[in-house]
């Protein structure tokens, strides 16, 4: 018998979601890569696997695999999908869940309008926690590229590593070419997600994100959180920021640098299917 899956998305950042509570699922890197192919597989940005947890206080394990098969520690858009998936398929009757990823714990709250708020934890700036190879923590870092040019960027971890660049216009930003160079830069030993941020006003930014292992996606929840945190810390934006991505808007709330940062946005079901091989 094949493995049942559900296709979901958060603002167009698309996933297959697998129930590992009621099914035994062991996918290899090669299998995930084949399934992610949009011509010969299903096609998705990430594969999400929800599993039972044996740890007190944790409702589920939440595993995230990029399209290249790499398991990563954070996906905010996926977390919203996981919350609605768990309730819809009867894995829980709760509206507030705690899930454990490879790197962090996340609190998920299903709101009355079926949007989901995700506690993304306290952002981390220390180079060793990102990780980034740097002698000391700095508001901004300079990276030398293969072509001899240098680029200035901010670096932060929100459960996964992010670089954030301030640009004048995201429509003309070299997201794919420069994003790829930065993502694979040796100063980021685990690769890095790269956000191109345009500040619109005190409460709004526009953003495009090159995701490690995926390329540019039309929405990235953790990227929105990372960019909003950088905007608040270094550009004096509000404690409530609307992040406009190609796929739609996310709301980020961060009352102070020592508090957890909260991501709120939608999630949607698309279809169900069965993996035959």
UniProtKB/Swiss-Prot annotation:
Residue positions binding substrate: 13, 46, 66, 76-77, 160, 193, 211-212, 221-222
Major enzyme class: isomerase
Origin species: Legionella pneumophila subsp. pneumophila (strain Philadelphia 1 / ATCC 33152 / DSM 7513)
Annotated protein name in UniProt: Diaminopimelate epimerase
Chain positions of site Important for dimerization: 271
Enzyme Commission number, as recorded: 5.1.1.7
Highest classification ranks of the organism: Bacteria, Pseudomonadati, Pseudomonadota, Gammaproteobacteria, Legionellales
GO cellular component terms given for this protein: cytosol
Subunit details: Homodimer.
Compartments where located: Cytoplasm
Catalyzed reaction equations: (2S,6S)-2,6-diaminopimelate = meso-2,6-diaminopimelate
Pathway field: Amino-acid biosynthesis; L-lysine biosynthesis via DAP pathway; DL-2,6-diaminopimelate from LL-2,6-diaminopimelate: step 1/1
Keyword entries, A-Z: Amino-acid biosynthesis, Cytoplasm, Isomerase, Lysine biosynthesis
Site feature (Could be important to modulate the pK values of the two catalytic cysteine residues) residues: 162, 211
Family assignment from sequence similarity: Belongs to the diaminopimelate epimerase family.
Any Pfam family: DAP_epimerase
Recorded GO MF terms: diaminopimelate epimerase activity
Organism superkingdom: Bacteria
Its biological purpose: Catalyzes the stereoinversion of LL-2,6-diaminopimelate (L,L-DAP) to meso-diaminopimelate (meso-DAP), a precursor of L-lysine and an essential component of the bacterial peptidoglycan.
UniProt cross-references to Gene3D superfamilies, sorted A to Z: Diaminopimelate Epimerase, Chain A, domain 1
Active site: 75, 220
GO BP, sorted A to Z: lysine biosynthetic process via diaminopimelate
């Amino acid at each position: 018998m094949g493995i049942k899956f559900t296709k979901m998305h958060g603002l167009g950042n698309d996933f297959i979601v697998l129930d590992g509570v009621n099914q035994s699922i062991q996918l290899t890197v090669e299998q995930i890569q084949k399934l992610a192919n949009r011509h010969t597989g299903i096609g998705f940005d990430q594969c999400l696997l929800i599993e039972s947890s044996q740890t007190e206080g944790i409702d589920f394990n939440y595993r995230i695999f990029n399209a290249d098969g790499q398991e990563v520690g954070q996906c905010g858009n996926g977390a919203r999908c996981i919350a609605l998936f768990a309730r819809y398929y009867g894995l829980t009757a709760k509206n507030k869940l705690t899930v454990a990823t490879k790197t962090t714990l996340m609190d998920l709250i299903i709101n009355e309008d079926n949007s989901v708020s995700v506690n993304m934890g306290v952002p981390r700036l220390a180079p060793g926690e990102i990780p980034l190879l740097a002698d000391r923590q700095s508001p901004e870092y300079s990276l030398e590229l293969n072509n001899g040019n240098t680029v200035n960027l901010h670096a932060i971890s929100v459960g996964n590593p992010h670089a954030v660049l301030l640009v004048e216009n995201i429509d003309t930003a070299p997201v794919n070419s420069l994003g790829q160079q930065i993502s694979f830069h040796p100063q980021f030993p685990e690769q890095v997600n790269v956000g191109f941020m345009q500040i619109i006003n005190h409460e709004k930014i526009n953003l495009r994100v090159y995701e490690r292992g995926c390329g540019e996606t039309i929405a990235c929840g953790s990227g929105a959180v990372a960019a909003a945190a950088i905007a608040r810390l270094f550009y004096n934006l509000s404690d409530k920021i609307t992040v406009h991505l190609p796929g739609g808007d996310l709301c980020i709330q961060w009352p102070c640098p020592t508090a957890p940062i909260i991501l709120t946005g939608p999630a949607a079901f698309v279809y169900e299917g069965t993996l035959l091989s």
